[in-house]
Structures are given as C-alpha cells and as structure tokens.
Regions:
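A short, active-site helix/loop in glycosyltransferases that binds the activated sugar's phosphate group
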Residues: 134-158, 193
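Helix N-cap/beta->alpha junction signal
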Residues: 81, 109-110, 143-145
Length: 225
C-alpha cells in the first residue's frame, strides 16, 4: 500500500530591504521578523531600489515584487502592513495568492487610510488598506479598538487575531536588581528591638538606623547610624 506523503505548509515572512539595507524597516517590523524567524518562519526577501536611475529603479522594483511568483504552492506568507512602496505591490500579492493558492496574513502596524498623515497619497493608502481587507486570510491587529474599526470596514471578525500589545521586543536587561540597603527608624532600644544586634551578621545588606536609645556597640561596617 502506498502511503500519501503529507505536505507541510511552508511559512514565510515578507522581508523588504531597501538598497540591500536590512535596517531600513521600522523597529516594529524588525522585531516581528525576529519573532517569526524564532518560530520557524523563513524570510522571503525582496530587495528594492530607492536610489539610482529612476527607470532602472522602476523596472528592478517591478521584477523584485514579481519574485513572489516563486513562492511555494500553498505557503503561508506574513506581510507587514503598510509597505511604503508603490501600491501595485498589493495587486501582485493578490495575483500570487490566486496563482499559487497561498495564505496571506497581514500584520498591521498602521492604517494610513485612518491616520490620514499623507494627504497627497491618501487615495493610494485607501486602496492598499481596502485591498488588504479583501485578500487577507488572517489579519493581526494590536487591540480591540483596531478590531472594532476593521469590522466597521467590512472585515470578518473571525479572521482577525488580537495581539493585545503594540511594541514587541525590549533590549533592556530583564534581570531585576534590588537595592541592598534597609532603613530602620524608631525606638532602637535593644530591649525592644533585640534583632538589631544580629544585623552585623548580614554582610550582604547595608542598614541605616534612625532613632533613639541605640547601643552603639552594635555598629559595624554594614550599619550606619
């Protein structure tokens, strides 16, 4: 009996570089790429030209996006949204989805049709946002407010997944450090606070004492009065 081989869905994230610069994207996009990579997703890299001859740049960028046609049949592709490139990229994604039967997951960082920061390109952003709503299989949003807005735009709530966070990775040291000093104030009479005589044995902590009736014989290198 011949067993059918199970096909494993290939998982990619779209990594767009500008003039071969991996740091051209925002921190949020870079963080998401790092998280996806750590979870078994592979980069599907597209390098665009921003500098140089405008005709060469236009042809190169068109061919670069058409490289998407080489993606594996039935793959899952995570796409950061928006991409600040020519709006035709979203049409190419739609054609690749139809041709290669891939699943598209859009991870929203901003909705420029909502922010309206680039008024001279507002029509383009409106087009890209609404095309994204239509061709997405999954949408990853930041919070409930964004999800509610997407639903008002006709997006099926079932395909929206809530991250509940906005930023992603923090470069700070996660090690918690405690101040190894303790202040004690009040009546320092050893009859009332007999534990004071034992503080000198706790070498890793410095004690600052404030109050009256202290027997100064208990003072040590780790005790200040």
């Amino acid at each position: 009996m011949i067993k059918e081989r199970k096909t494993v869905m290939k998982k990619y994230y779209l990594q767009v570089t500008i003039d071969s610069n991996l740091d051209a994207s925002t921190k949020a996009v870079q963080d998401c790429n790092k998280i996806l990579h750590q979870n078994g997703y592979e980069p599907f890299e597209i390098n665009l030209y921003k500098s140089g001859n405008k005709y060469i740049k236009k042809v190169h960028n068109f061919l670069a996006f058409n490289h998407l046609n080489k993606i594996d049949e039935g793959a899952l592709l995570v796409v950061p949204h928006p991409l600040y490139v020519n709006k035709k990229y979203i049409d190419i994604l739609e054609k690749v989805k139809q041709k290669k039967h891939i699943k598209l997951a859009f991870l929203i960082h901003d909705l420029d049709s909502l922010r309206k920061l680039f008024l001279n390109a507002q029509d383009d952003f409106e087009y890209m946002d609404h095309k994204m709503y239509d061709i997405s299989d999954y949408i990853i949003a930041h919070n409930d407010c964004m999800i509610d807005y997407l639903v008002t735009q006709g997006v099926n709530r079932e395909k929206i997944h809530n991250l509940h966070i906005f930023d992603y990775l923090c470069e700070s040291n996660n090690t918690i450090k405690f101040d190894r000093s303790v202040s004690i104030a009040g009546n320092l009479d050893e009859k009332k606070s007999n534990y004071l005589a034992k503080l000198k044995d706790i070498k890793a902590v410095h004690f600052d004492l404030y109050g009256v009736r202290l027997n100064e014989d208990i003072l040590a290198s780790n005790i200040t009065y």
